[in-house]
Amino acid sequence: MNDTSFENCIKCTVCTTACPVSRVNPGYPGPKQAGPDGERLRLKDGALYDEALKYCINCKRCEVACPSDVKIGDIIQRARAKYDTTRPSLRNFVLSHTDLMGSVSTPFAPIVNTATSLKPVRQLLDAALKIDHRRTLPKYSFGTFRRWYRSVAAQQAQYKDQVAFFHGCFVNYNHPQLGKDLIKVLNAMGTGVQLLSKEKCCGVPLIANGFTDKARKQAITNVESIREAVGVKGIPVIATSSTCTFALRDEYPEVLNVDNKGLRDHIELATRWLWRKLDEGKTLPLKPLPLKVVYHTPCHMEKMGWTLYTLELLRNIPGLELTVLDSQCCGIAGTYGFKKENYPTSQAIGAPLFRQIEESGADLVVTDCETCKWQIEMSTSLRCEHPITLLAQALA
């Protein structure tokens, strides 16, 4: 990103109007002041860095709204990485090192899940680490997706058409069933699924919590693996997570300065890739699924402009009654909503969405983002699933 791109700002403040945090937290100066205006000051003197930038949730809604295409969110994230001299806390280490925590927790998932659901344990985490006791903590799977995949790797290799799956931390450590659902859907379309030779967390939690150098190292590892899949094997890379997809495509070059040139156009969200294949003439044997569902658009999905592909894909399911929520950010913003100081802001941001869901009369909520799923299931009475899971359920 050009460090002088803030000069394109015309001071219209439409970004502040679109900002979920500005609406509920008066302590945040807003994206215009935190981004373009603040950058002018920071370039003169780094001591003018404002700690309030930590309230930015990196939702990118300011960038979607900006008529001058100023990369406001990127400016803020880069400023935090460059000027914030605060040493990351143990809490931020625990929340951001998802590969480490997942590797340690999955072998003991039943014990870990039981412990973290106990009120005394959550009170202890609140007091010791400032992880808010009101936040429901994600559950771990007993065994990883990558380990399970070994049992089907030979079978997947038999398909003529292949894709590489960037599964991300959520599928690997928390919800392997989503990865299994994707394989089921792709196999039904005549496509086999490979995994990248090496995969690390996409880096978004690390960026958000002050571990930018670690995020950059992991990004380099992922880019090398993606380059092997795309350049050597000649197959595309798809992901089920909207945030992982966005990071691989856009955050790597814009925030981490990791070159993904020649790869970006070969990295796609699974729903978009599937829609394109159906549009090209491929078919899926889908049976009726008589459900009333509402779709929540994740922030990074909004930024990529790919919501329509997921919606059109879901409309291929017979009997499915689909309504798109008039929703903004759900408020969790990855690790942001787990932090004690952010919990009230997180829930206030999501409150309009929660009301819409409760008043919808729907059977189910659908979204492409795993942390949105956690927030919705904690804050409403409905279950939330990924679009791929609905497709898998509808397969005849």
Curated annotation (Swiss-Prot):
Pathways involved: Polyol metabolism; glycerol degradation via glycerol kinase pathway; glycerone phosphate from sn-glycerol 3-phosphate (anaerobic route): step 1/1
Domain of life: Bacteria
Alphabetical list of Gene3D superfamilies matching this protein: Alpha-helical ferredoxin
Chief location of this protein within or outside the cell: membrane
Record: residues binding [4Fe-4S] cluster 2: C19, C56, C59, C62
Binding residue positions for [4Fe-4S] cluster 1: C9, C12, C15, C66
Compartments, as annotated in UniProt: Cell inner membrane
Entry keyword Kinase: no
GO terms (BP aspect): anaerobic respiration; electron transport chain; glycerol catabolic process; glycerol-3-phosphate catabolic process
InterPro entries: 4Fe4S_Fe-S-bd, 4Fe4S_Fe_S_CS, Cys_rich_dom, G3P_DH_GlpC_su, Helical_ferredxn
Domain 4Fe-4S ferredoxin-type: 2-29, 45-76
SUPFAM superfamilies: alpha-helical ferredoxin
A GO term, aspect molecular function: iron-sulfur cluster binding
Keyword entries, A-Z: 4Fe-4S, Cell inner membrane, Cell membrane, Electron transport, Iron, Iron-sulfur, Membrane, Metal-binding, Repeat, Transport
Name recorded for this polypeptide: Anaerobic glycerol-3-phosphate dehydrogenase subunit C
Classification lineage: Bacteria, Pseudomonadati, Pseudomonadota, Gammaproteobacteria, Enterobacterales
